[in-house]
């Protein structure tokens, strides 16, 4: 149950991050914070840096959630191999996204890099969606098994 909640929260955070990233890109504020990882004003940004800084903060939080999801998935005794692989790929993609995000800023929003950043984000989203799908399947399987054992117990009592 915890893995189901964690993976869904991670996917929701990732969706929010992609939404914010789209806004950053479309509104042209991608270089308002031209240094990485901090803005020129230091740890707490001034108003003109707030949108880009917010994107970076949500990215850091989302990356931690992706890594936590992987850790709990790998630790799970009932998670299938496909779920574990998807969580590993998602974690690798998240680390790649952080690195690529820094390179995008350093290279001043080079179009190819921005496009690759979007593409890798879609891979990350797909892998997390797969992890969520698996986690919902796990909870359905548990309910099915509980019903099945309950039915078996009641039939042996008759």
Locate the predicted segments by residue.
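Polytopic transmembrane helical bundles with strong interfacial aromatic enrichment
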Residues: 1-158
């Amino acid at each position: 149950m915890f893995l189901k909640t964690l993976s869904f929260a991670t996917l929701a955070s990732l969706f929010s991050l992609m939404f914010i990233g789209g806004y950053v890109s479309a509104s042209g504020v991608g270089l308002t914070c031209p240094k990485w990882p901090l803005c020129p004003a230091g740890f707490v940004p001034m108003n003109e840096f707030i949108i880009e800084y917010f994107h970076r903060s949500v990215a850091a939080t989302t990356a931690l959630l992706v890594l936590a999801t992987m850790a709990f998935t790998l630790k799970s005794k009932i998670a299938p191999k496909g779920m574990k692989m998807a969580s590993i790929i998602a974690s690798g993609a998240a680390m790649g996204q952080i690195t690529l995000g820094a390179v995008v800023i350093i290279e001043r929003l080079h179009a190819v890099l921005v496009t690759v950043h979007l593409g890798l984000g879609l891979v990350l989203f797909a892998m997390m969606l797969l992890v969520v799908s698996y986690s919902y399947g796990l909870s359905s399987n548990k309910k099915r098994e509980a019903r099945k054992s309950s039915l078996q117990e009641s039939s042996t009592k008759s």
